[in-house]
């Protein structure tokens, strides 16, 4: 107060004001502060002070020929005085206004192309909807987020090469454009930017925005995709939030979202196959997301999610060193531990063999809806500070931390037997057994944990076993906080190894990820995911399996046909027929298979006729291990659309319908493709006419001597076999019919069989 009075007193004297306003500042320290270094110390003041001058801008001398000396109002636009220290002229801000209104027009065609990201942002905001503002405490946690909507996913180096190639194509310097995306973008941009007058530097900056993912570590409550992050300043403050729905989506968010869905589907499917790692790699390599190969996306996309990281590990890529348990990402922030196998008894006296972490450690736990800080010693939870969106999310985090602590009271809280299995029907490891058990019901766990009196600490509150908040008591060591726990900020990646059961370990052998950690959440992908692997046919249900199986046969008919006649066993064992087996009722699979294989053998041998449609239709049934029985079937059942549907052995059905005139096959009403050769061709060429009374058995067989001409055939006795030369110099093996009754069919059969034998 005294100082203020003193100052007021000083100011009331007229001389003081004069001294302060008129005297020059010549204190050395001040002069030094504002003049040393090239960095402007007070930019906004400098700007205001400059703009208050009459001619704050300098311009090239040529401007005096392009701009009049005075505008319509008679105000001077430029000074006749030269700028001190350069040969430029001094210009008034009014000159800029004049130029904007009356200056030359240039073509604006390139602007939307160069400033694409800005134009798109304006569109998104224009069509976005802002909802009401709510005032409430915001639990924000820092997460690494994408701040640049609408970008491709090139690495900085790849983008640099593309930019140099597009903007400065004639500059010297080694540039290697290797990836498909690099080449596509370069070609596209070169075409777009022909005759572009915008400065190359500006073009380069804007291209960088379009090509590279930029991430920042920002406090976020709510959506983390880039279209939300670009309006972060509008949607959440310290004590308020505003609802917002983006007015458009961007490809990079869609890629991230679709990649997670594809990876989850692939890991879940691989986990139940005979060789999970090989299957996973096969699927990753044969899958496309939005038209781009999944493996290319995995190499470039930094998304960290359990399934995505398992796929990356399988491809030998580095991943984050944090590990996953119970859907939370754990990152050790201090301490260390050694692992030791220990046997313990549950409350149900079941023995569990658990790898115990011995030593003091601190972790951050980050989940989708809750975060926590955990301090633990050997089999002891010391402290857990949780924050989350709601009671349910907080409870989830507490359960995971309690199981992770490996405390005895947690193991003793198990009621009943632990026998949880994974998708492949294998028992889960003990830690996941415990986790599943308590996720189902944590009442006993919370009740047995113990409670304690708590001190009043700002921003922290206790939580009771029934999850109600309390200021006096809390479950032992557990507190709920208003503040979130930040995600681990470092983006370091480490080399990992993966075993055939998809368990990912760091170099010290700690398990970072396993298929148990992959979320079961189902979502709908934003971009089309094309799984070419037959293992993924069942992802869209039984109908998809049916259609895909038959489409595969039709697409590969040429090779299938040859295998059918020469090496059927190999054909029956093809993995493409595996998914189909799940559609055939278990009890009858073996009989169907035996029946179809016998039928096929008859076709190959003497009796009956070769019928393409029938082979295609029945082939998938022959893949199951056959049971020998004398049973005959006129129709075979498949389980689709919630019930058994019939496929007729001879003739069409709603499930399998072949149209002879259009040559199109429809499965359950869906188009399954065209057969290139018509199975029931009635063309009787010379051969079929002459070969009436003979059965074509297959390719030439040298044991039956040199090829006869068609005319020499008449000398054969019934049942005798011979090689015969037909049509275009091809040789086939034939046999003279024993009975004349079947002669009629021969001319139709012959054409087909000749074609089969030749091919």
Curated annotation (Swiss-Prot):
Motif Nuclear localization signal boundaries: 736-739
One term under GO cellular component: host cell nucleus
Pfam families per UniProt: Flu_PB2_1st, Flu_PB2_2nd, Flu_PB2_3rd, Flu_PB2_4th, Flu_PB2_5th, Flu_PB2_6th, Flu_PB2_7th
Main location: virion
GO MF term set: RNA binding; RNA-directed RNA polymerase activity
InterPro entries xrefs: Flu_PB2_2nd, Flu_PB2_6th, Flu_PB2_C, Flu_PB2_CAP-bd, Flu_PB2_middle, Flu_PB2_N, INV_PB2, PB2_helical
Any one Gene Ontology BP term: symbiont-mediated suppression of host gene expression
Keyword terms of this UniProt record: Cap snatching, Eukaryotic host gene expression shutoff by virus, Eukaryotic host transcription shutoff by virus, Host gene expression shutoff by virus, Host mitochondrion, Host nucleus, Host-virus interaction, Inhibition of host innate immune response by virus, Inhibition of host MAVS by virus, Inhibition of host RLR pathway by virus, Inhibition of host RNA polymerase II by virus, mRNA capping, mRNA processing, Viral immunoevasion, Viral transcription, Virion
Listed Gene3D superfamilies: Polymerase Basic Protein 2, C-terminal domain
Localization terms from the record: Virion; Host nucleus; Host mitochondrion
Site positions (Mammalian adaptation): 627
Functional description taken from the UniProt entry: Plays an essential role in transcription initiation and cap-stealing mechanism, in which cellular capped pre-mRNAs are used to generate primers for viral transcription. Recognizes and binds the 7-methylguanosine-containing cap of the target pre-RNA which is subsequently cleaved after 10-13 nucleotides by the viral protein PA. Plays a role in the initiation of the viral genome replication and modulates the activity of the ribonucleoprotein (RNP) complex.
Family per similarity comment: Belongs to the influenza viruses PB2 family.
Subunit structure and binding partners: Influenza RNA polymerase is composed of three subunits: PB1, PB2 and PA. Interacts (via N-terminus) with PB1 (via C-terminus). Interacts with nucleoprotein NP (via N-terminus). Interacts (via N-terminus) with host MAVS (via N-terminus); this interaction inhibits host innate immune response.
UniProt protein name: Polymerase basic protein 2
